[in-house]
Amino acid sequence: MAPGVTGSITHAAGFAAAAVARVPDYLGLGIDIEQVMERDVRQSIEHSIITPSEAACLDLQDGDFSRESLLTLIISAKESFFKATFPAVGRYFGFEAIEFSGINVQEQTLSFDVIETLSPALHLGHRVVLRFGYLDPTTVMTSFTWRRNPLDNR
């Protein structure tokens, strides 16, 4: 990455995307594209990739999305979060560092709670909000913009 900028790239299912921003305003950007997983895949991996709290939160969702779509969105969002924060955190961390806490369908946002302190700005209990959208009926895209001003992190 060139000095003074941050960015992210992604590709899947015939789609590709890139995002860049100036470092003074943005600490990191993360984007991810994923194909919505099939039901048999979801059934075989769900309990190994989400926490019991996340599973309970998924159970409370009102049915706007299939469980496969929701799980794909969660995985994609965690990937976007990792891409945006890894350069500042400076170490590898697992997807369990943040925990899904809700979805706002109208605003197309996903909320996550930080459950492992990653940096002074990303401490235990901090809430992050990521955006999502559909590129087609079976392909999702998520993004996380980590801004210097924490009130702008949407």
Report each predicted region and the residues it spans.
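Conserved nucleotide-ligand handling architecture
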Residues: 1-154
